[in-house]
């Protein structure tokens, strides 16, 4: 959530900055009207409180003199009733302002390129050279069928479209990938591993920005005979980041770096007809998430570090990729700056997103009231939060199957994964 004081004092300027966000126009008139109502009711509340306090003192003095105070008491009671009414009106207006503020995206950083969609993203660099095959390249679906490791028909039978069953050595590689990523991030990059719930409450989803705006992208669950509604996590970013909700952290304990391997669940609303073949876009997929909680002045530096750590996974797997700086029209709702890492997919002859690394600035921290305080300082300040995929396990599996395929349909196991697969070098029929 944007700083309400900043929004209040610089409404036109912020509205102009947010125009570059795809599909968003800040309703300046509505916000201005609500602000005027807030100011009027705030002044009225303070005036009534002052008058009531003054009248109460008058009652005390009159009572001490033995005077009749019944009329004064009636006036104070009337003021109290009026004050309660005004307070209720003020609370309603403040709720409206907050609900409006919760739908406003983050302000892009100055260095973020202007643009409408992904065609305006800026390529930063490419790493590795796509392999040239001397045989006809198969996609991961065909390779999975040859090896008996990807069963999309079973996924449809069990659950429906955009689900799959992964079996045998392909399932083993899928597990090996997650273990390799976790070991890299915990042993070399300084992250602490976390195991978190896959079901979260609405307060948690508000904290990281999925609600109220993106409820249709979630799977919601309401157990029988239970009033509590949950949602399946769309990413481990949600529970991991919320671990600092309502906390005041000693600045000496920052940065906090956490990683988690979880399944992720997304309804893929609005993506009908896109990537209907294979593992690229699923309702359920695994991901290793990276989260950092940092001091405000260090968040841009932390974004570079976090992105480099996600890149290291691709480099160790020797998978060609490119790094892209997202434009204003393609960034996520809560991000101020985002890098995407796109891995080479031979059968599609293109790069596809495998990681998105974002600096959320104080956007999530304000929603969560996650703060830090320096030693000896009474004042607190909001932390900055960052997150990124390190990496999406299913898409990494896709990239390995296609980039490491052989003419007979077998798959060469990347060297760094072999210790996790009992030394297996080739996955064959």
Curated annotation (Swiss-Prot):
Cell compartment(s), UniProt: Cytoplasm
Binding site for L-serine: 235-237, 289, 389
Gene Ontology MF, one: serine-tRNA ligase activity
Reactions catalysed according to its record: tRNA(Ser) + L-serine + ATP = L-seryl-tRNA(Ser) + AMP + diphosphate + H(+); tRNA(Sec) + L-serine + ATP = L-seryl-tRNA(Sec) + AMP + diphosphate + H(+)
CDD domains assigned: SerRS_core (cd00770)
Keyword terms of this UniProt record: Aminoacyl-tRNA synthetase, ATP-binding, Cytoplasm, Ligase, Nucleotide-binding, Protein biosynthesis
Pathway(s) annotated for this protein in UniProt: Aminoacyl-tRNA biosynthesis; selenocysteinyl-tRNA(Sec) biosynthesis; L-seryl-tRNA(Sec) from L-serine and tRNA(Sec): step 1/1
Binding site for ATP: 266-268, 353-356
Record bears the keyword S-adenosyl-L-methionine: no
UniProt GO BP: selenocysteine biosynthetic process; seryl-tRNA aminoacylation
Cysteine disulfide partners in this protein: none
Enzyme's top EC category: ligase
Gene Ontology cellular component terms for the protein in this record: cytoplasm
Pfam families referenced in this protein's UniProt entry, alphabetically: Seryl_tRNA_N (PF02403), tRNA-synt_2b (PF00587)
EC number(s) per entry: 6.1.1.11
InterPro entries listed in its UniProt record: aa-tRNA-synt_IIb (IPR002314), aa-tRNA-synth_II (IPR006195), aa-tRNA-synth_II/BPL/LPL (IPR045864), Ser-tRNA-ligase_type_1 (IPR002317), Ser-tRNA-synth_1_N (IPR015866), SerRS_1_N_sf (IPR042103), SerRS_core (IPR033729), tRNA-bd_arm (IPR010978)
Subunit structure: Homodimer. The tRNA molecule binds across the dimer.
PANTHER family recorded: SERINE--TRNA LIGASE, SERYL-TRNA SYNTHETASE
Family designation: Belongs to the class-II aminoacyl-tRNA synthetase family. Type-1 seryl-tRNA synthetase subfamily.
Functional note: Catalyzes the attachment of serine to tRNA(Ser). Is also able to aminoacylate tRNA(Sec) with serine, to form the misacylated tRNA L-seryl-tRNA(Sec), which will be further converted into selenocysteinyl-tRNA(Sec).
Domain notes: Consists of two distinct domains, a catalytic core and a N-terminal extension that is involved in tRNA binding.
Name of the protein: Serine--tRNA ligase
């Amino acid at each position: 959530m944007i700083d309400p004081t900043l929004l209040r004092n610089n409404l036109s300027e912020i509205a102009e900055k947010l125009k570059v966000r795809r599909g968003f126009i800040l309703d300046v008139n509505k916000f201005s009207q609500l602000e005027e109502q807030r100011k009027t009711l705030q002044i009225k509340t303070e005036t009534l409180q002052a008058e009531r306090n003054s009248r109460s003192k008058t009652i005390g003095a009159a009572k001490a003199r033995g005077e009749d105070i019944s009329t004064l008491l009636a006036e104070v009671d009337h003021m109290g009733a009026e004050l309660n009414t005004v307070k209720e009106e003020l609370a309603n207006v403040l709720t409206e302002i907050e609900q409006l503020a919760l739908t406003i995206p983050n302000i892009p950083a100055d260095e973020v390129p202007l643009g409408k969609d992904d065609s305006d993203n800026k390529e930063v660099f490419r790493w590795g050279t796509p392999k040239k095959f001397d045989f006809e390249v198969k996609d991961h679906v065909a390779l999975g069928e040859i090896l008996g490791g990807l069963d999309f028909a079973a996924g449809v039978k069990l659950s429906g479209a955009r689900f799959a069953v992964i079996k045998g050595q392909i399932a083993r590689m899928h597990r090996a990938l997650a273990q390799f990523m976790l070991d890299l991030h915990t042993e070399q990059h300084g992250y602490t591993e976390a195991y978190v719930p896959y079901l979260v409450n609405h307060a948690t989803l508000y904290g990281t920005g999925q609600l109220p705006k993106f409820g249709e992208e979630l799977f919601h669950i309401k157990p029988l005979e239970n009033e509590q509604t949950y949602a399946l996590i769309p990413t481990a970013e949600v529970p991991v980041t919320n671990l600092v909700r309502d906390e005041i952290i000693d600045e000496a304990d920052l940065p906090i770096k956490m990683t988690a391997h979880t399944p992720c669940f997304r309804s893929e609303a609005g993506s009908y007809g896109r990537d209907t073949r294979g593992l690229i876009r699923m309702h359920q997929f695994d991901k290793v998430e990276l989260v950092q909680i940092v001091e405000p002045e260090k968040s841009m530096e932390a974004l570079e570090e976090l992105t480099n750590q996600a890149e290291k996974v691709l480099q160790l797997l020797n998978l060609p990729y490119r790094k892209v700086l997202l434009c204003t029209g393609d960034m996520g709702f809560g991000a101020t700056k985002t890098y995407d890492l796109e891995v080479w997919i031979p059968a599609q002859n293109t790069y596809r997103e495998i990681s998105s690394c974002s600096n959320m600035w104080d956007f999530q921290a304000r929603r969560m009231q996650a703060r830090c305080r320096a030693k000896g300082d009474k004042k607190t300040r909001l932390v900055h939060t960052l997150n990124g995929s390190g990496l999406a396990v299913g898409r990494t599996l896709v990239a390995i199957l296609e980039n490491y395929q052989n003419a007979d349909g077998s798959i060469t196991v990347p060297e760094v994964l072999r210790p996790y697969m009992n030394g297996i070098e080739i996955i064959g029929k």
